[in-house]
Amino acid sequence: MIFWTDPNKPDSADELIAGAEKYLRPIPGVSSFHVGRMVKSHRDVVDQTYQVALNLQFANKRLQDDYQLHPLHIEFVEKAFKPNCQRAVVYDFE
């Protein structure tokens, strides 16, 4: 996922990252978890318009589907995503 945080809220990226650590990392079925800030680059090909990225890996599609419905994921959306983000893009792939 790629997140564009609220520019009117200076701590929004930190709050989003903390929320991902708190709510998403412990969800069963997540085999790999990485959340972090955008890294500045001198290369024109690198998108530098976002503030935070999240990469999660699952062993199979069923675990990913279960993750979407997990109460901690729903809590993350309500308590960390909605208060801090203006936009997000999701890329699901094998």
Regions found by a protein language model. Name each.
Residues 61-89:
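C-terminal structural segments of small proteins and small subunits
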